[in-house]
Amino acid sequence: MSTTRTLLPVIDVNGVSKVFNAASPNPVQALHDVSLSIHRGEIVGLLGTNGAGKTTLIDLILGLTTPTSGTIQVLGESPHTAIKSGRIGAVMQSGGLLPNITVKETLELLGAAFPSHRAFDDIIERANLGDILSRRVSKCSGGEQQRLRFGLALLGDPEVLLLDEPTTGMDAGARHHFWETMREEADAGRTIVLTTHYLEEAETFAQRIIMLN
């Protein structure tokens, strides 16, 4: 791999603004002229007050919405292309789960979407899912569902992990296990971007903090 390619940012956000309901009498400016670069192996925390645009920025990097102006590249590609190739994994605050199947069935169903994936035993251990495998998703607590989302994010062995309030609903023990696992993932060279309202978590885990306001 060339030195130039190694130094290219994994995530490159250039002059991005996002306005919701732009054509209405009351448009909402979620982000204004945001630029940032995140490099391979970095652990970066996105902090800001409610409404600062943290989740909107994560959604943009994931290609779930498009910027009103500016550009975003992930691993040198459009967010949509990077997601489609399985190079990005994400843990979101809510949604994305089928309530009427078990945790194990969820892993198997999503695993089938990848040409190849990490071993289920590895995912189960790293996401601490062993005690809830046979439980229906609808019967899982909020913290248990977050653990499942984390496992699903790791399935495709992604190069980038985006974590939007990943420990929401987790008890102290589950949060500790989660961050220990995240450190191991970062040590393996994965790039990690997280939002959290737990300032102590961000200061402890992130190598760099970016404030949005």
For the regions a protein language model found, what residue spans apply to each?
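Helix-to-loop junction immediately C-terminal to a conserved catalytic motif
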Residues: L62
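Catalytic Walker B motif of ABC-type/P-loop ATPase nucleotide-binding domains
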Residues: L161-E165
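Conserved ABC ATPase "signature" region
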Residues: E108, A112, H117-L133
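Conserved catalytic motifs of ABC-family nucleotide-binding domains
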Residues: D157
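Walker A (P-loop) phosphate-binding loop of ABC-type ATPase nucleotide-binding domains
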Residues: T49-G53
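Conserved ABC transporter NBD signature motif
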Residues: G70-H80, K84
